[in-house]
């Protein structure tokens, strides 16, 4: 099962629906769910959803603090991506302009999260803030003309972040990205 931490984003149910469509068991839980309850669910992976504010990410940061107790792949989407970057020492700030549109990203490193995708993909973005600088020990996976860090991965741990929304129908190959994450988790 993949746990989806609900950070109050408008697309959180789309993440769940896409995973279910792919045949993956998934569950949306409040981001305030205690760590012991999350551990008892024995997730194979965790997704940090998008949301309105880094100040309202509940226990997501605690999951990162206690990563060795979970030891499962993590995917941060939009706000979740920013949270991961900030936690590991990256820089998050306002973008040059708010993005609420389709953006073409360039995949720099196919990696396992983008396996089988073309080098350029149009994705849906819905954010004001963005990762301005990669955290130490992270690799850049994708970028765009409007955002320097569209996707990243920890060099040693299966921790990923994407600025865009793979769960939204407008994102080309979005279901493939979530399928690849489910494969990384051993759920497909």
Curated annotation (Swiss-Prot):
HAMAP family cross-referenced by the UniProt entry: GMP_synthase_A (MF_01510)
The protein, known as: GMP synthase [glutamine-hydrolyzing] subunit A
Chain ranges of the Glutamine amidotransferase type-1 domain: 1-188
Functional pathway: Purine metabolism; GMP biosynthesis; GMP from XMP (L-Gln route): step 1/1
PANTHER family for the chain: GMP SYNTHASE [GLUTAMINE-HYDROLYZING] (PTHR11922:SF2), GMP SYNTHASE-RELATED (PTHR11922)
CDD domains: GATase1_GMP_Synthase
Gene that encodes the chain: guaAA
Subunit (UniProt): Heterodimer composed of a glutamine amidotransferase subunit (A) and a GMP-binding subunit (B).
Gene Ontology CC: one annotated term: cytosol
GO MF term (any one): ATP binding
Pfam family, one: GATase
Catalytic activity: XMP + L-glutamine + ATP + H2O = GMP + L-glutamate + AMP + diphosphate + 2 H(+)
Source taxonomy: Archaea, Methanobacteriati, Methanobacteriota, Thermococci, Thermococcales
Protein function: Catalyzes the synthesis of GMP from XMP.
Organism, scientific name: Pyrococcus furiosus (strain ATCC 43587 / DSM 3638 / JCM 8422 / Vc1)
InterPro entries cross-referenced by the UniProt entry: Class_I_gatase-like, GATASE, GMP_synth_GATase, GMP_synthase_A
Assigned keywords, A-Z: ATP-binding, Glutamine amidotransferase, GMP biosynthesis, Ligase, Nucleotide-binding, Purine biosynthesis
Enzyme Commission identifier(s): 6.3.5.2
Catalytic center residues: 78 (nucleophile), 165, 167
């Amino acid at each position: 099962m993949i746990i989806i931490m609900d950070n109050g984003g408008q697309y959180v149910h789309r993440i769940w629906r896409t995973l279910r469509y792919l045949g993956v068991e998934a569950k949306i839980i409040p981001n305030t769910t205690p760590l012991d309850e999350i551990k008892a669910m024995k997730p194979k992976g965790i997704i940090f959803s998008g949301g309105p504010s880094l100040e309202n990410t509940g226990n997501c940061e605690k999951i990162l603090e206690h990563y060795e107790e979970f030891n499962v792949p993590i995917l941060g989407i939009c706000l979740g991506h920013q949270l991961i970057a900030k936690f590991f020492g990256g820089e998050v700030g306002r973008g040059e302009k708010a993005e609420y549109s389709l953006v073409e990203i360039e995949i720099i490193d196919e990696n396992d999260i983008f396996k089988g995708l073309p080098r350029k993909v149009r994705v849906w973005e819905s954010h004001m803030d963005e990762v301005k600088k990669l955290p130490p020990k992270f690799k850049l996976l994708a970028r765009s003309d409007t955002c320097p860090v569209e996707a990243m991965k920890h060099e040693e741990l299966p921790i990923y972040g994407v600025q865009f929304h793979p769960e939204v129908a407008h994102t080309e190959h979005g279901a493939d990205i979530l399928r690849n994450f489910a494969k990384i988790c051993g759920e497909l």
